[in-house]
Structure formats: C-alpha cells, structure tokens
C-alpha cells in the first residue's frame, strides 16, 4: 500500500515507519495517524520502529484542524485518536519509538503508545495542551500517569512545560538516550524479532495492561473543554503567536 504522510521500509522481521509530513515538524493530522495505524497493524507481524523524518518525531496535532470544532466534534476526534493509539498499543508485537527533535502533544502521546522509547539527547518533550485551553485527548493523561505516577504526571500536564530527554530518562519515560537513537532502536527491534512470538506477545499484554474505562473520562473531558471560550482563545492565540488571554482563571 502507498502512503502520503509516512514512509515504510521492511528489513527482515522489522518494519521501520517514518512520519514524513510536508512540514519539518511532522504535525499529526488524523489522516497521518490512520496511515501509521495501517502500517503497524499490517506489518506482517513484524517488530515496528516508529520515527520521524526531518527535524522532529512530531510536534503534535495540527492545531489548524481545531478551529471551529465544538464539543461533539472534539469528542469524535478524541475517540478516533484513542482508537488509533489503543490499536498501536495493543499490537501484539513490540513497537519502538525512535524520537528526536520534538515530541509534543499528540506526538508525545503517540510515543507513549509505543512499548519502548529511545531518544536523541537534545530532544524536547511536552504535553502543552493546557496552554491552548484544552487537555491531552489521545490517552496522554493515563499513559503518562502509568509511567511516572500521579504527582509527576499532574505537574507535567498542568504546567505544559518542556523537558529534556535526560529528564525523560530520569522519569523513566524514555528507556535510553543515544545520539544513535534510530540505529539503536532498529538494532533492538531486530533482537526482539528473534524472541519467541507467543511469549513476547503475552509479556507485552501483561506489562502494558490498562482497563479500557480509564480512557473514557479523558475523551469526555476533551469534548467538554472544546465548548469553553478559553479553548477558542487558546487556539487563536497559538495561531497568532501571542500570549492567550484566558477568561476563566
């Protein structure tokens, strides 16, 4: 199958999926996410390495697509995004994120849906949605909490601050920081591809288990904030490259 927004390369038991949008920061449209899901789920049971071309893994969702969304449309967007992230997280073979540049917002949530994360040293991470008057809507609140605990997850999400690959490793968000991040990810994928498939599938299922209902309130909350005027102000301020003037603070 041919793709518009990603590149796919198969190497034995490994598939390398590269996000390659026209923008150098690889913003995630829903079409891009659908292509990533298709490339992962139809990889012929290969171990997958997911990375980004150009300057970033992904700087997040395409904010232009948020303009004009109401609560119902936002809930539908969150629901499809959740379905895609859950499909990647639930893929029975390991998925390794090779991250560089930026992993912001939906790009960070995409990385969190992977099983292992290997980062280049100068990579920056953030869930900055709070600064747009919204919140992470593709599983980020729950997957981050699962990794770092409630206190750290709350601080990261409520401030929207950026943090380094080194801090991400200290917080156990990333497994490894390496200048050779992509080569290391592919080498690890090749190693995992040699492991017994059924045992590895069950290990992943048990270690990664999260009840489905933990994501329901996040989707509902994502829809709620899109009906608030602060969301419209936050998105408009972002697009106009100015500080937002939130009413409800």
Kindly give the residue locations of the regions a language model identified.
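C-terminal long alpha-helix characteristic of the crotonase
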Residues: 22, 34, 118-123, 171-219, ...
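Acidic, divalent-metal-coordinating active-site segment for phosphoryl/phosphodiester hydrolysis
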Residues: 161-167
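CoA-thioester-processing core
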Residues: 84, 88-90, 98, 104-158, ...
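Glycine- (often His-adjacent) and acidic-residue-rich active-site loop
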Residues: 52-87, 103
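Structural motif
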Residues: 51, 98-99
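Conserved CoA-thioester-binding segment of acyl-CoA-metabolizing enzymes
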Residues: 1-53, 86
């Amino acid at each position: 199958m041919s793709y518009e927004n990603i590149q796919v390369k198969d190497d034995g038991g490994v598939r390398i999926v590269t996000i390659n949008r026209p923008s150098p920061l690889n913003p995630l449209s829903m079409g891009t996410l659908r292509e990533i899901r298709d490339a992962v789920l139809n990889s012929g049971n290969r171990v997958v390495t997911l990375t980004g071309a150009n300057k970033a893994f992904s700087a997040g969702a395409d904010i232009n697509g948020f303009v004009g969304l109401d609560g119902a449309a936002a809930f539908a967007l969150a629901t499809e995004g959740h379905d895609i992230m859950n499909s990647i997280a639930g893929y029975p073979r390991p998925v390794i994120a090779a991250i560089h540049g930026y992993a912001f917002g939906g790009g960070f949530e995409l990385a969190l849906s992977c099983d292992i994360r290997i980062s280049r040293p100068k990579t920056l991470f953030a869930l900055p949605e709070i600064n747009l008057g919204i919140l992470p809507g593709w599983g980020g609140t729950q997957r981050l909490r699962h990794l770092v605990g409630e206190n750290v997850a709350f601080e990261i999400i409520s401030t929207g601050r950026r943090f380094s690959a080194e801090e991400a490793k200290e917080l156990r968000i990333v497994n490894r920081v390496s200048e050779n991040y992509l080569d290391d990810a592919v080498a690890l994928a090749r190693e995992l591809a040699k492991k017994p498939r059924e045992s590895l599938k069950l290990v992943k299922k048990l270690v990664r288990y999260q009840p489905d209902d933990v994501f329901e309130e996040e989707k509902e909350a994502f829809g709620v904030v899109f009906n608030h005027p602060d969301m419209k102000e936050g998105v408009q301020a972002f697009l106009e490259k100015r500080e937002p003037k939130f009413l409800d603070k």
